[in-house]
A protein has these predicted regions:
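Short amphipathic alpha-helix with an adjacent loop that forms part of the alpha/beta core around
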Residues: 2-10
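Donor/substrate-binding cores of folate-linked one-carbon enzymes
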Residues: 12, 16-125
Length: 126
């Protein structure tokens, strides 16, 4: 409720979410561009425990995904996705750091060409 109230006051053009809460339909309807940065490769590792599952998995790649936020958890169309090798010799902390750095790279890319990604989003929504 607080997020909705605050966002309604500032009326953002782009809303970027980083947390694991289900977004209500009224929030998604009110704002045109709502994105979620998910610290796993979607659609492989959805949900609240997706991050830990991906880090502990035997999959050859792990990564980070920026997607359109939808009412259904982690179901939105993918806007940007970056991958790295999942090296079994690396500790979980090293893997976490690498994933967070991928998230930063994704956000830099997204905001460096925002018009392109907003047009891409409009096309994916239609």
């Amino acid at each position: 409720k607080l997020l909705f109230k605050y966002a309604s006051l500032i009326k953002p053009n782009v809303t970027l979410l980083f947390y694991n809460y289900i977004i209500k339909k009224n929030f998604l309807d009110k704002f045109k561009f709502v994105f979620n940065l998910h610290y796993t490769l979607l659609p492989k590792f959805k949900g609240l425990d997706g991050f830990e599952k991906s880090l502990k998995s035997k999959h050859s790649e792990i990564g980070c995904t920026l997607h359109i936020a939808e009412e259904k958890f982690d179901e939105g169309k993918i806007i940007i996705q970056k991958k790295i090798k999942n090296l079994s010799k690396e500790s979980l902390n090293i893997k976490k750091q690498k994933i967070f750095l991928l998230g930063i790279r994704i956000l830099k890319l997204f905001f460096s060409d925002l018009d392109y990604y907003l047009k891409k989003t409009e096309n994916l929504k239609n």
